UniProtKB/Swiss-Prot annotation:
Coiled coil: none annotated. The keyword Disulfide bond applies. Colipase is a cofactor of pancreatic lipase. It allows the lipase to anchor itself to the lipid-water interface. Without colipase the enzyme is washed off by bile salts, which have an inhibitory effect on the lipase. Enterostatin has a biological activity as a satiety signal. Expressed by the pancreas. Keywords: Digestion, Disulfide bond, Lipid degradation, Lipid metabolism, Secreted, Signal. Induction: Expression levels increase upon lipid ingestion. This is Colipase. SUPFAM superfamilies: Colipase-like (SSF57190). Forms a 1:1 stoichiometric complex with pancreatic lipase. Gene3D superfamilies: Lipase, subunit A (2.10.80.10). The keyword Transcription does not apply. Disulfide bonds join 34-45, 40-56, 44-78, 66-86, 80-104.
Length: 112
């Protein structure tokens, strides 16, 4: 138990000692390895396969494939950029398997 506490304290100290605005565990740039979308500046941690390495990447642009939400913090398809909505079918099974895909659409443009 002591070893775990010491390891945790050391990990936190290293994270806070990181120079500049970019940390070791947060504010990661596109292309850097991540384990959760909250670590990325873009707020999208994506992998291609279940065993693939997840990396930070930009959010989906208009007319690109997207995922509306994730239960796990890692996407197969990133959510849409600000101002766009991910339009597509949603199901409980798709939410669990992280396969609820849609297409990013500009909701203001589609109403006109």
């Amino acid at each position: 138990m002591k070893v775990l506490v010491v390891l945790l304290v050391t990990l936190v100290a290293v994270a806070y000692a990181a120079p500049g605005p970019r940390g070791l565990f947060i504010n990661l740039e596109d292309g850097e390895i991540c384990v959760n979308s909250m670590q990325c500046k873009s707020r999208c941690c994506q992998h291609d396969t279940i065993l693939g390495i997840a990396r930070c990447t930009h959010k989906a642009m208009e007319n690109s494939e997207c995922s509306p939400k994730t239960l796990y913090g890692i996407y197969y398809r990133c959510p849409c950029e600000r101002g766009l909505t991910c339009e597509g079918d949603r199901s409980i099974i798709g939410a669990i398997t992280n396969t609820n895909y849609g297409v990013c659409l500009d909701s203001t443009r589609s109403k006109q």
